[in-house]
A protein has these predicted regions:
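Catalytic Tyr-x(3-8)-Lys segment
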Residues: 26, 136-143
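Conserved Rossmann-fold SDR core element
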Residues: 52-58
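Conserved cofactor-binding/catalytic machinery of classical short-chain dehydrogenase/reductase
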Residues: 23, 40-41, 149
Length: 180
């Protein structure tokens, strides 16, 4: 099983993304090296399957989240950041400074831990768009995103490895363009 990434699709891919738009136009510049490596892996799997009769299947997980995720507001992906922002805003809104300080001791924000003064904590959270009863989400709001619980992806991966063969997804006529 080869795990690809949705970043392999073109920057301007239609939504929802059809599989056949792979390699049809430029990639998102900031993801390009990673995307090219993933595309190379997919193509390697296809080539090995065709040339050596192997049974490599490539799947493209969407945005995964789950246990042990990265909730650091400065380095996390979108969903863990949103979950944490909402949690911290709720703590502020309800005045639950104990829970807020505990959270910030585990994961300081911009170097500010739960041991800091209330004004310091409020200031750093405000810079992150976290206020009592209010959460500011960044970005344009235009990207469409899908999220999948990591344990469901794990279950699907096991199922695919046990029940899906390359020949099941291969088009019998013409070129193999992608097999995910």
């Amino acid at each position: 099983l080869f795990l690809g990434s949705t970043c392999i699709y073109p920057r301007e891919a239609p939504q929802p993304m059809p599989e056949d738009c792979l390699l049809t136009s430029p990639l998102e510049y900031s993801n390009e090296p990673y995307a090219i490596a993933k595309i190379a892996g997919i193509k390697m799997c296809e080539s090995y399957n065709l040339q050596y009769g192997t049974n490599y299947i490539a799947v493209m997980p969407t945005n995964l989240y789950g246990p042990n995720d990265n909730f650091n507001l400065e380095t996390s992906h979108v969903l863990p950041a949103m979950i944490r922002k909402i949690h911290l805003a709720k703590c502020l809104h309800t005045g639950d400074w104990e829970a807020l300080r505990k959270d910030m001791d585990i994961r300081p924000v911009e170097g500010v831990s739960g041991k800091a003064s209330e004004p310091e904590i409020l200031s750093v959270l405000d810079k992150q768009g976290i206020r009592p009863g209010e959460v500011e989400l960044w970005g344009t709001g235009k990207p469409l995103r899908e999220f999948l619980w990591s344990e469901e992806m794990a279950d699907a991966s096991v199922y695919i490895m046990e029940h899906v063969d390359f020949e099941d997804v291969r088009q019998k006529e013409g070129e193999v363009r992608n097999t995910h």
